Amino acid sequence: MKFRPLGDRVLVKRVEEETKTKGGIIIPDTVKEKPQEGEVVAVGPGARNDKGDIVALDVKAGDRILFGKWSGTEVKVDGQDLLIMKESDVLGIVEA
């Protein structure tokens, strides 16, 4: 299934966190926090401004982003667990 977000929404795949600490301790799923970093899978066309013109988003597919702890709605697309959120929920782009 092909999924295209509407408006200023962004489809994000969470980046998996390490399951083991540097000291070798394995972190069980019950105490792990969900990662707040992800990769943008797809973006909508943008939000409309006061004049009705579409303003393109700052993020694009392939960007690695940081987002708030409670941001987005969890969805399942083609068997993958993804998040859909507004661009305003994105805190920033991680640059290499």
From Swiss-Prot:
GO CC list: cytoplasm
Gene Ontology annotations of biological process type: chaperone cofactor-dependent protein refolding
Cystine bridges: none
Source taxon at top rank: Bacteria
Subcellular location: Cytoplasm
Keywords tagged on the record: Chaperone, Cytoplasm
InterPro entries: Chaperonin_GroES, Chaperonin_GroES_sf, Chaprnonin_Cpn10_CS, GroES-like_sf
Main localization category: cytoplasm
Presence of keyword Chaperone: yes
UniProt KW Cytoplasm keyword: yes
Alphabetized GO MF terms: ATP binding; metal ion binding; protein folding chaperone; protein-folding chaperone binding; unfolded protein binding
Family: Belongs to the GroES chaperonin family.
Function: Together with the chaperonin GroEL, plays an essential role in assisting protein folding. The GroEL-GroES system forms a nano-cage that allows encapsulation of the non-native substrate proteins and provides a physical environment optimized to promote and accelerate protein folding. GroES binds to the apical surface of the GroEL ring, thereby capping the opening of the GroEL channel.
Quaternary organization: Heptamer of 7 subunits arranged in a ring. Interacts with the chaperonin GroEL.
Record-given protein name: Co-chaperonin GroES
